[in-house]
Amino acid sequence: MKKIKYLLLVLVMTFLITGCQSEETSKTMVCSRTINQDAISMDLKYTVTYKGKYVEKVESIEKITTDDTTVLDAYKQAVETTYQPYSKIDNYSYDVKVDGNTLISTVTADYTKIDYKKMLEVDTANQQIFTDDGKVKLETIESFYTKLGTNCTKDK
């Protein structure tokens, strides 16, 4: 009888320990801002997928709307020049297009798979977001977007 009680106790303890340590799930933080200035409207939206204190993926969608095609062309050229050096980095993609009077820039980075050393080769300023082991902390990204004037909300 003592052996049965002991085995039951071991089983219950094992269940409690393993059952209560469920794997952390991915969550989302969305940072956004709208700017209206001099006949130009900007909608900025950054969707950050994270697990624990580390970022897994970031998708940014930046929209610039104006009736001035010269301004749109200038923004498009500037965005393409900025992101073109990243085009050969796996797990990093960008797309820039003009739809009517709106420029839409979409950038996606999967930080769980990206070669952060290649990111540093493109621009050493990227070192600000990476830890020594190539991870990106959520607090670093949140601080960066907050400095841009965005409001960030996290999943509960």
Segments predicted by a language model, with ranges:
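Intrinsic disorder/low-complexity segments enriched in polar/small residues
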Residues: Y6, S22-E24
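C-terminal motif of bacterial Sec signal peptides marking the signal peptidase cleavage site
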Residues: L16-G19
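Core hydrophobic alpha-helical membrane-spanning segments
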Residues: L9-M13
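Bacterial N-terminal signal peptides that target proteins for export
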Residues: M1-L8
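Subset-of-secretome marker
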Residues: E24-K156
